[in-house]
Amino acid sequence: MKFRLGWRSNKTSRLTQSAIAASSQKLSNSSISVWGGFCTLLFSLGCCLSPSASAAERLTFRAGLLQQSVEVKALEDFLKTGEVPAKLKPYEFLLTPNVKEVLSKRLHIDPILVEPFLADLFSSPDGEKLLEQLSNALPGTTPQQIKETFSLALHQGDILSFLSFISAYPDENLMLDLAEVAKIGMQLNASAWQNRLISPRLERDLRVETGEDTPVNIDPATSGNEAVSMATFRLRDRTRQRNIPVDIYYSINTHGPLVVISHGFAADRKFLRYLARHLASHGLTVVALDHPGSNISALVQTALGTKLSQLLPASEFIDRPQDVSFLLDKLEILNRRKGLLQGKFNTQQVTVIGHSFGSYTALALAGAELNPKALRSFCQAVMPLERSPADWLQCAGAELPYGKRQFKDPRVAQVIAFNPIIGNLFGKDLSQVQVPTLIVSSSEDGITPTISHQLQPFEQLQGEKYLLVAIGATHLSVTDISNSNSTVGQSTLVREVMGKEAEPMRQLAKAISLAFIEQLTPAAKTYQPFLSPAYVQSFSNDNMAFRLAQKLPLSLEAWLSVFYLTNPQIGAREDENKFSLLKAIEGYFANAKQILSPPMDCTAQLDRLFNSLLDNYDRDRDKLS
């Protein structure tokens, strides 16, 4: 299997048309980590362990006015043994285990795929910004030299690493500006350390000690009494020339709203199969659909010669919600026809469940306006290396030529958004969503950062809302356990918790989804106790902790205020910097960003900094009140 721009597999071979067909089943379980892998690929600066005929033999470290050269061989020894060369002893504090891990990272790729991918990127405005950043980190190089080095390296093998880039560099000496490298490191890891900082606060501040008792005769996490049947259809939208495969899960005794499941980018309708069967066993009809322009099949078909702009067409931001509305129209007709499925579809009361990009679909149908204009402003302001994988994905929508687009479908009565990609897709217009909404966030999500894609959107929602936080879970923890054997599940770049260790996440997903959906039925009061913080917390174990809230406490709102002030491009909030104290916090943190070492090594320092600042903020606010 060879479609790997960032993930790792134990098998490597040239990608051909026959290989695509042979690997499509394995690919069907992968997800948007192509973006995460791509960002990591760029940070690794290179390719191919095979040395070129005129490879760089020395690496010069520059820190301000200081310079120190070291043989590449000495750096190789350091990465193998961990022993710091004598000439690098003054820089030992920078050569942390995490730095060693990054420099040692080896990425398996297919040059046939990556070369046109990078060529397309480098010719774009984002690519020009990226090359400028890399040129600053490698003084004495030009953007053209960097592109040529990538090209040379790509023709020498199918493994990427930092040392590989050095071996492909045509001059004998390569200079590395440590300050610029640190900036790149901070940009690349920004969402990771933000998640690391916010997770302990979420776990602590959302914790409850006691709660109301839940009914002893009902367990929403266990299967219901209904036998589940499944039917597969392929619907044809002739107006838009789209074939939409759907799986329908149903039982003899049907009640409640219709449930529609929308998958994420590069996934398919099977990704939440366990959840669909569970809900159907309790008498709900569930329809899971494929979005033909952004599912795994579309990705496989465009894999050979893929350009960055082709991986996710901007039109998918329009087609996805229209796919669901088209589906509901067809199900209304099917609901009236005589047969096994007659009366099975309550299309006037629909709960849409989305995962990742599918959550965008769900929220758009619930009334959030797609705002390409606001999205363009964000994507133009953020440097390529600052983007999370989810940001790369959402910025594909910036190509749409509209100011705003509305896809609200009045039949949608609820939304469940697992690990949603939201960010700046809706600008400030997420407040237009008035239907009950459940957002599920994972603290170790390497794809969708907690703050900008879940916490900020949660605060914007104005209707009935719930936030479920899974500390220790990852982007794909909520998906079917069969996905743990996928390429992304085995990735060494985007860590995923998907096997048996993620079972508490899946059990809770079944319970909370059923309890939430039942709020639209006469059994609402019976299931209400299962929407309590205490019940959700009861699923916690040594590896995962779960929290539920309908409103963020003031302590977390203050923490987020600091974040918004120091990251104005992430999301617009009202003028919260009226207080001079908050302005001081902004300046203090901005300075701290410049002096702290890369995020994985400074989490504790940043946490202490934030705790101190927020304690002072609380005291000063008390004085003002």
Where are these regions (language model features)?
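Short beta-strand element of the alpha/beta-hydrolase
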Residues: 255-264
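Mature extracellular/secreted ectodomains of secretory-pathway proteins
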Residues: 66-71, 75-212
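Gly/Ala-rich beta-loop-alpha elbow adjacent to hydrolase catalytic centers
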Residues: 354-358, 362
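Alpha/beta-hydrolase active-site loop
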Residues: 309-343, 382
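N-terminal cap/lid segment of alpha/beta-hydrolase-fold proteins
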Residues: 204-254
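Cap/lid segment of the alpha/beta-hydrolase catalytic domain
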Residues: 266, 270-273, 278, 290-319
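Short beta-strand/loop motif that positions the catalytic acidic residue
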Residues: 433, 439-441
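Short alpha-helix in the alpha/beta-hydrolase fold that links the catalytic acid
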Residues: 435, 449-458
